[in-house]
Amino acid sequence: MQRDIMRYLNPSLRDIAAYSVEGGQQAAIKLNQNESPFDLPMWLKDAIVSEFVREPWNRYPDILPYRGTKAYADFLGVPAEGVMMGNGSNELLYTIFLACLGPGRKILVPDPSFSLYEKLALLLQASLVRVPLKASLDFDVDAIIQSAQEESVDFVVLSSPNNPTGKSITFDDIRRIASSCDALVLVDEAYIEFSRQDSALPLIEEFPNLVVLRTMSKALALAGMRIGFAIGRPELIAEIAKPKIPFASSRLAEITLMHVLENYAIVTDAVSYILNARDELYGELLSVQGVEPFMSDTNFLVIRVPDADAVFRKLIGRGILVRNVSGYHLMKNCLRFNIGLPDENSRLLDALLAINGGMA
């Protein structure tokens, strides 16, 4: 018997595509997911595993991971009651969106921005207010404030630094938005360690409607561990945490986080390398004919080329995997790639020079 299974499901699923990574996740030079090029050193992994094997594997972890939460709160110098740890910042986005949105409620998102924001808004049947970026891919702060006020939005989500553009909002402009909008304001700081702008964290003391999101997947090189944090006023975090999945963070994730925070020089050294390599590669790309690089506040660069699809395919043919972000608003013929190891950056640059010269 034939049945239309969609009639059993949330009708919003018709408007949502499954998440996918064009080109896959395997390549000789993998630069498409904004990962750190550095894995943890083996001596640190050994210390983490040595502690983890002494944990009881037959017992559930804590409902909320208090050890990891306290470790990160102490690292930031904020009260642990104002910090929520999750299984990656994406899990926390699900949690926060569930807490804030539903049918009839409005969310404002700059466009383009991280694709998960729109997906979650559609899934929760909220009304989406898109505010286009400027042609330079910078945020249009005045338009954000005006739209938030005119549309009476309930929720404003700002990716700063922004994925996929690499641009940041200034500290003062975030203050303007938080003070001008009668809405919860979420600042997703996944790439803040690479930014020229200051974090919005100090504004939490000033604005009870502000939440800052952090991930350990980028600067801390823990993408495989799935660790993220939301930081806000304790009374706000207590409410936002209500729809959170219990037991979502593993003991291994907590132990790993604590060891990395105790050895944070590893992170600062990696960030220093990435910043220097980013600026060096940006400067070299300026001299490549037919390639327009954009300044970045992240661990990745965006370039515009005459034909992004063709360049993307030719790079794959050379074993180099980047991200084709041409489908985003204002980003026609744009490619995105994270900073890799020195040899990877050199091979990418050489490939772009060769492709631009007409070589296959």
Swiss-Prot record:
It is an enzyme of class 2 (transferase). The modification N6-(pyridoxal phosphate)lysine is found at residue 218. Keywords: Amino-acid biosynthesis, Aminotransferase, Histidine biosynthesis, Pyridoxal phosphate, Transferase. GO terms for biological process: L-histidine biosynthetic process. CDD domains: AAT_like. The keyword ATP-binding does not apply. Its cofactor is pyridoxal 5'-phosphate. It catalyses: L-histidinol phosphate + 2-oxoglutarate = 3-(imidazol-4-yl)-2-oxopropyl phosphate + L-glutamate. Its EC number is 2.6.1.9. Pathway: Amino-acid biosynthesis; L-histidine biosynthesis; L-histidine from 5-phospho-alpha-D-ribose 1-diphosphate: step 7/9. InterPro entries: Aminotrans_II_pyridoxalP_BS (IPR001917), Aminotransferase_I/II_large (IPR004839), HisP_aminotrans (IPR005861), PyrdxlP-dep_Trfase (IPR015424), PyrdxlP-dep_Trfase_major (IPR015421), PyrdxlP-dep_Trfase_small (IPR015422). One of its GO terms (molecular function) is pyridoxal phosphate binding. Belongs to the class-II pyridoxal-phosphate-dependent aminotransferase family. Histidinol-phosphate aminotransferase subfamily. Homodimer. This is Histidinol-phosphate aminotransferase. It comes from Chlorobium phaeovibrioides (strain DSM 265 / 1930) (Prosthecochloris vibrioformis (strain DSM 265)).
